[in-house]
Design a protein with these regions (language model features):
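Juxtamembrane, membrane-proximal amphipathic segments and lipid-exposed surfaces
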Residues: 1-2, 83
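A general marker of short, structured functional hotspots
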Residues: 2-8, 13, 74, 165, ...
């Protein structure tokens, strides 16, 4: 049954979801950049990030139920360290965690049209893993952004992994 559902989903994924993901990333990324420049990075993060993530969960479709959100103090800053199993980790965290935060992400993501400029203008932190001095400077910048209820999210593996095995953790998050 699972294989049948997988096969049934493939045309939808390639004809509807993937094109939607590409277009929505470009549109929401540019919108976020403009909002961050002219209105507020916080509003840009909500519209360009949280709304984009929830919309992509809906179109995928992924149904998310969050438990325990009432235990999170929105005025408190947190360092959140999460495993990175798929692209959907980003949708779930951005769309449903319910707090203001900045991502710490690999610099290569800066090159994605829409996404890169949107994330930069919102204030997310890019890590250049090929240059340790720049990486350390980026981590210091991340530490400075953990104020007034703004948190930081790391994926300590540095990238997604295929399968269920965890990758080796990088030092930056710790």
């Amino acid at each position: 049954m699972r294989k049948f559902l997988y096969l049934l989903y493939q045309p939808y994924k390639w004809l509807v979801y993937i094109p939607f993901l590409l277009v929505s990333t470009l549109v929401f990324g540019i919108t976020a950049a403009l909002l961050a420049i002219f209105v507020s990075p916080r509003l840009a993060s909500f519209i360009g990030g949280a709304l984009w993530a929830k919309l992509n969960c809906y179109v995928t479709p992924i149904f998310v139920k969050v438990k325990g959100r009432e235990n999170v103090d929105k005025k408190q800053s947190y360092v959140i360290v999460s495993n990175h199993q798929s692209q959907f980790d980003i949708f779930v965290l951005y769309g449903y965690i319910g707090i203001e935060f900045k991502w710490v992400m690999k610099y290569e993501l800066r090159k994605i049209p829409g996404l890169g400029i949107g994330c930069e203008k919102i204030g997310h932190v890019f890590i250049d893993r090929s240059d340790s001095e720049k990486a350390i400077a980026s981590l210091k910048a991340a530490r400075e952004r953990i104020v007034n209820g703004t948190s930081i999210i790391f994926f300590p593996e540095g990238t997604r992994r295929i399968g269920n095995r965890l990758g080796e953790f990088k030092k930056g998050a710790f």
